[in-house]
């Protein structure tokens, strides 16, 4: 059975500046590099290696994938890219619209501003992953993506998380892949929070 390790990139310059970072990009910070090393240490400690490594086409994800895996042969996939925040790209996060009461995502709030609907993001990421999975018989895959993209995927999969849980930098979702390429979340691992583990 294939195991998919889907993780968020390390901290970036825009993260520290609290700027919206979707389709725009910024480099990993020194802390972001350290976070990637924490994730790498987790995989090494658990004896986990990867048959193939994938990342979004954005630099912050590809650089994280290379650092975590220790490999240069990272396959870039556009479908793993971060959500498009439209006119809010690179702007202060404080300018973003607020979630509707009771909501746990932007839903379609950014569409009028040229952004994406989080549900469409989730479908895009899900379809991209399934396309890879249906064409492989490999046992262990690493994919590096982005916070909102991963959240959208989990919404598409109808996964619920405990209150207050979010994808911090280099958060790792461990999925078991069934024969029909469907995904079952087994664990969420947070290397930057003393390797805290949530089981599902």
What are these regions (language model features)?
Residues 38-100:
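Phosphate-coordination/substrate-recognition cap region in phosphate-metabolizing enzymes
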Residues 46-49, 132-139:
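Glycine-rich phosphate-binding loop signature in dinucleotide/nucleotide-binding domains
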Residues 2, 76, 83-94, 137-139, ...:
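Acidic, low-complexity terminal tails and accessory targeting/binding regions
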Residues 100-120:
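Short glycine/proline- and acidic residue-enriched helix-loop micro-motifs
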Residues 4, 139-147:
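Generic beta-sheet signal
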Residues 147-151, 171:
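GST superfamily/GST-like fold recognition
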Residues 67, 152-156:
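Active-site signature of alpha/beta-hydrolase-fold catalytic machinery across serine-
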Residues 4-62, 113-126:
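Loop-to-helix element that buttresses phosphate recognition and phosphoryl-transfer chemistry
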């Amino acid at each position: 059975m294939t195991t998919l390790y889907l993780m968020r990139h390390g901290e970036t310059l825009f993260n520290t500046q609290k700027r919206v970072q979707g389709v725009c990009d910024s480099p990993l910070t020194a802390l972001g590099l350290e976070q990637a090393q924490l994730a790498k240490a987790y995989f090494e400690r658990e004896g986990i290696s990867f048959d193939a490594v994938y990342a979004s086409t954005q630099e912050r994800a590809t650089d994280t994938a290379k650092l975590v895996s220790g490999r240069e042969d990272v396959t870039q996939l556009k479908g793993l890219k971060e959500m498009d925040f439209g006119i809010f790209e690179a702007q202060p996060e404080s300018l973003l619209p607020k979630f509707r009461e009771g909501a746990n995502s932007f839903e379609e709030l950014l569409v009028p501003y040229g952004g994406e609907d989080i549900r469409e993001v989730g479908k895009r990421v899900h379809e991209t992953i399934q396309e890879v999975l249906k064409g492989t018989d490999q046992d262990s895959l690493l994919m590096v993506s982005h916070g909102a993209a991963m959240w959208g995927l989990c919404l598409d999969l109808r996964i619920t998380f405990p209150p207050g849980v979010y994808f911090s930098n280099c958060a790792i979702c461990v999925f078991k892949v069934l024969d029909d390429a469907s995904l079952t979340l087994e664990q969420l691992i947070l290397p930057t929070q003393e390797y805290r583990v949530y089981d599902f």
